[in-house]
Amino acid sequence: MNFETIIGLEVHVELNTNSKIFSPSSAHFGEDPNASTNVIDWSFPGVLPVMNKGVIDAGIKAALALNMSIHQHMHFDRKNYFYPDNPKAYQISQFDEPIGYNGWIDITLEDGSTKKIRIERAHLEEDAGKNTHGTDGYSYVDLNRQGVPLIEIVSEADMRSPEEAYAYLTALKEIIQYTGISDVKMEEGSMRVDANISLRPYGQEAFGTKTELKNLNSFSNVRKGLEFEVERQAKILRSGGVIRQETRRYDEASKGTILMRVKEGAADYRYFPEPDLPLFEIDDAWIEDMRAELPRFPADRRASYINALGLSAYDAGQLTATKALSDFFEQAVALGGDPKQVSNWLQGEMAQFLNAEGKTIDQIALTPENLVEMIAIITDGTISSKIAKKVFVHLAKHGGSARAYVEKAGLVQISDPAVLIPIIHQVFADNEAAVADFKSGKRNADKAFTGFLMKATKGQANPQIAQQLLAQELQKLLD
């Protein structure tokens, strides 16, 4: 029997506010254990939460970016459970009235087609702390993360393969990153994914029993974990077994999933309205203010790059990988840069430089103005493409005018025949054996002179003019 795969994803995104959702403690990553905490985070008796307005701002932006309706009469709820990293013994979250609901995004599949994935809800909540189990036999609790604001984005079970889940996460990460509400760095825990997966016979409408997967710390592991679960569940069902509703974690060492616990339901958490926070009214003006702060999103930019600028779908996809890169490209084109040439430099030398330096595009000195000027002096013959690579590295590290640097460093391309011909004659004089080979009929010997000339001019000879003059002067040797 063959089965259809049913996948839904729950994505937790940490919001990049300066302070936590209900306390003034820092929400920044990387502090010493328990350095970013106060009495609210430790749940001392009598302390009360105070709402961070910036969190609601971010929630509205996320809902709008994901094509969601917004609950304009919004409240918070208590989700009750006990765990050492949760000192209150409950989490402040949203249950029946999340900030966003009924949304969707389009994903691009491997064959280039698109598919709409519905999003059930997006709700705001506080993050829990972190438990660390030491080699000394003790467990340690770090509450720096306790109270860091989260938005949990819950998709409908619309994905039918691990590949579709991967494409959904890629598109979702792009959109959230463009809004500026999170850096969505999985390596720092600011984007975390839980996956729900079940199988059903083809033609059956009812969903099968789902399994929740955790410990999916990369998009690649999401795909691998789901692929393993498809095989595991199919094997059980084909043998006449029954799938239990349970939570499993992906184990990188074994490339499989391991049982954690029997899955709880909503009733186990005993949700009820949070009594220490008021009802929040989100009026139309607030929503429109947040809408005005949103950028053009990747899909719109890609379409523009393809249809208006004539770029390939591949180039458009690469250029919209991050908002910073896309903004840089658009600014360079607006300044008169040729779209294809700008694209080539950003995907080539820029990508290599950023990778080698471990930096992002907004951390280097090169500006769109610098790049456009550099491309212009390549086009007008002031420098060669080879020299331009050296110029690019200098500009990326130090900024400034490309033309001024080229002139100061003596990198201007030599195009004047009156300058090049004497150098060619000197090359002949310095390489008598090669000249003799050429005169004796070893015609391939002429190729060596190109290298000799470029070495003599330190790579500054104009390649086209140099080739013409070399051919001219070599012919004279035979006359």
From Swiss-Prot:
Keywords: ATP-binding, Ligase, Nucleotide-binding, Protein biosynthesis. One of its GO terms (biological process) is glutaminyl-tRNAGln biosynthesis via transamidation. Belongs to the GatB/GatE family. GatB subfamily. This is Aspartyl/glutamyl-tRNA(Asn/Gln) amidotransferase subunit B. Allows the formation of correctly charged Asn-tRNA(Asn) or Gln-tRNA(Gln) through the transamidation of misacylated Asp-tRNA(Asn) or Glu-tRNA(Gln) in organisms which lack either or both of asparaginyl-tRNA or glutaminyl-tRNA synthetases. The reaction takes place in the presence of glutamine and ATP through an activated phospho-Asp-tRNA(Asn) or phospho-Glu-tRNA(Gln). The lineage of its organism: Bacteria, Bacillati, Bacillota, Bacilli, Lactobacillales. It comes from Streptococcus equi subsp. equi (strain 4047). NCBIfam families: gatB, PRK05477.1-1, PRK05477.1-2, PRK05477.1-4. Heterotrimer of A, B and C subunits. SMART domains: GatB_Yqey.
